[in-house]
């Protein structure tokens, strides 16, 4: 299993190829490729590369799926024994990012399903021949 820890939006996130993650808003359009260079750790088949603070030669590539707004967060402030109350709320802007690959020193790690995918071989025998063979 391959994973990396990246830093984006002031947060550290553990990411794996082939999965999507909700992160802080990125200034890109949907279906656009994004390369994240701030990689703190890469793990592949038991070999761990830890950066000080960043891993040199490591990048994480992904595709922006969509932008949306998160759930409303209510902030309520109150001072006891006083008549001071404030109720405010906000919605965070979020980007959904699909992680395509993790690269370490030129070696590219992709999701296991993507590496094994091949074009399916279609049987090109006409349907009439199949029916006559069945009789």
Curated annotation (Swiss-Prot):
Belongs to the bacterial ribosomal protein bL21 family. Keywords: Ribonucleoprotein, Ribosomal protein, RNA-binding, rRNA-binding. InterPro entries: bL21-like, bL21-like_sf, Ribosomal_bL21, Ribosomal_bL21_CS. One of its GO terms (molecular function) is rRNA binding. The gene is rplU. This protein binds to 23S rRNA in the presence of protein L20. Pfam families: Ribosomal_L21p. The keyword Cell cycle does not apply. This is Large ribosomal subunit protein bL21. Residues 114-135 are annotated as: Disordered. Part of the 50S ribosomal subunit. Contacts protein L20. Residues 125-135 have a biased composition (Acidic residues). GO terms for biological process: translation. One of its GO terms (cellular component) is cytoplasm.
